């Protein structure tokens, strides 16, 4: 480089050149704040038979060597909970699929398994279970995780798919979890889909299901108050996430996948899922919004990824109009902030009528039909953080700088592989809680921490 003699005599120019050289030398050594995992905790190996029989004596005769898992279906940290304690929940139990004559059959490794709420402590490198609450009906009998209705749910089979199991109207596929300051629980459930109210002992107080669903003979009260259109949910894709408002009067529920409306082909190709708002005092749905998924191949470039692999899981109520929503595939997970105040409330509209054509799920762009979807802002790309496991489902905020997440390991049994004795052959997938230090603090008000928003 040749410098002009006149300019090199300029003291300001010389100082600027020296500064540039100094900064260039520093760049390789500079570090920038990054989102990172600061602690990881793992659930120790515990046989299901040992775990459940301690709670419900004699309920499990053979667990087929399946270990307790899937407690990370959701993660709750209440405002008064110790920093190292969380509430978690299993799903319906270890299950899988086996093809018979070209058709998949839903298998249940341990049909007696009972969905359970657990209070845990992160200690050392382990998830320590402090308390376990099995979910039971009004009679005190376990609800189990078996499907409810013929032609509505999948038919249940035993581990080998050779024996048809009985349906159970009480059965629950529990997923989302919140806990009130009074100690009772609200749960998002996938079979109906339904909202479940459970007392502090695990007894079902009431189950809220879609209108028109022929669910009878349950061991607990049932209220048919949800929009009838929700009866078109894709099997195993019901209410995956649930959030609670700060005044504990409002629930927010996310539907894991678009409804199969009007049919399976349309639903599995759709990008339009739904968010439901439920008023606890009146026991009524008060609002409904459209959540639009990202384009699947842009979100997760995995060759096996299709629009049907896009899902919603955890959700946190930041304030009365803002939710933090976990959008994911099995491999990629991102947190988005969505604004309810800027979206169309479609409750009671033609989009809840099965006769409407085209359906909401069929719309390539809901805006062309006058529907404003929830505006999304990316908050955190979890999959960009080194060490993040697959299938993140639970999220909880400890403070504006710290996020806790949990994964669902599917009881390490989803491959449906078994040995000569009929025992599970797993891959060693584990259940974890991970603490994440956020590079950019979230602008939270104190009441938003731990999934709680400001009172209205």
Regions found by a protein language model. Give the residues of each.
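Short, aromatic- and cysteine-enriched interfacial helices/patches
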Residues: 3, 30-32
């Amino acid at each position: 480089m040749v410098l002009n003699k006149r300019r090199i005599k300029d003291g300001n120019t010389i100082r600027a050149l020296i500064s540039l050289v100094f900064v260039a030398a520093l760049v390789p050594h500079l570090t920038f704040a990054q989102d990172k995992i600061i602690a990881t905790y793992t659930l120790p190996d515990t046989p299901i038979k040992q775990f459940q029989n301690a709670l419900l004596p004699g309920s499990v005769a053979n667990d087929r060597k399946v270990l307790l898992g899937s407690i990370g279906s959701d993660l709750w940290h209440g405002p008064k909970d110790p920093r190292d304690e969380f509430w978690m929940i299993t799903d319906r139990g270890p299950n899988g699929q086996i093809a018979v004559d070209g058709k998949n059959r839903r298998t249940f490794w341990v049909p007696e398994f009972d969905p359970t709420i657990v209070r845990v402590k992160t200690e050392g490198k382990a998830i320590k279970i402090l308390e376990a609450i099995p979910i039971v009906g009004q009679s005190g009998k376990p609800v189990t995780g078996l499907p409810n209705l013929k032609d509505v749910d999948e038919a249940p089979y035993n581990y080998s798919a050779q024996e048809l199991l009985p349906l159970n109207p009480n059965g629950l596929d529990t997923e989302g979890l919140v806990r009130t300051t009074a100690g009772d629980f609200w749960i998002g459930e996938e079979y109906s889909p339904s909202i479940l109210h459970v007392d502090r002992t695990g007894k079902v107080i009431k189950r809220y299901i879609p209108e028109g669903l022929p669910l009878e003979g349950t061991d607990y009260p049932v209220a048919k108050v949800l929009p009838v259109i929700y009866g078109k949910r894709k099997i195993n894709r019901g209410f995956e996430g649930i959030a609670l408002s700060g005044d504990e009067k409002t629930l927010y529920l996310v539907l894991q996948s678009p409804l199969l409306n009007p049919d399976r082909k349309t639903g599995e190709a759709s990008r339009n899922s739904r968010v439901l708002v439920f008023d606890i005092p009146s026991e009524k749905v008060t609002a409904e919004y459209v959540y639009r998924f990202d384009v699947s191949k842009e979100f997760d470039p995995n060759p096996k990824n299709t629009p049907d692999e896009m899902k919603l899981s955890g959700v946190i109520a930041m304030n009365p109009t803002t939710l933090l929503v976990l959008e994911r595939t099995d491999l990629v997970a991102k947190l988005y902030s969505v604004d309810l105040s800027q979206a169309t409330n479609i409750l009671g509209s033609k989009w809840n009528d099965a006769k409407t054509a085209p359906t909401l799920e069929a719309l390539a762009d809901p805006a062309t039909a006058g529907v404003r979807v929830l505006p999304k802002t990316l908050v955190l790309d979890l999959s960009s953080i080194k060490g993040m496991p697959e299938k993140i489902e639970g999220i909880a905020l400890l403070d504006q700088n710290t996020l806790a997440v949990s994964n669902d390991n599917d009881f390490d049994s989803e491959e449906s592989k078994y040995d000569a004795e009929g025992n599970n052959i797993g891959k060693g997938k584990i259940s974890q809680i991970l603490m994440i230090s956020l590079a950019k603090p979230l602008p939270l008000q104190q009441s938003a921490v731990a999934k709680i928003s400001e009172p209205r």
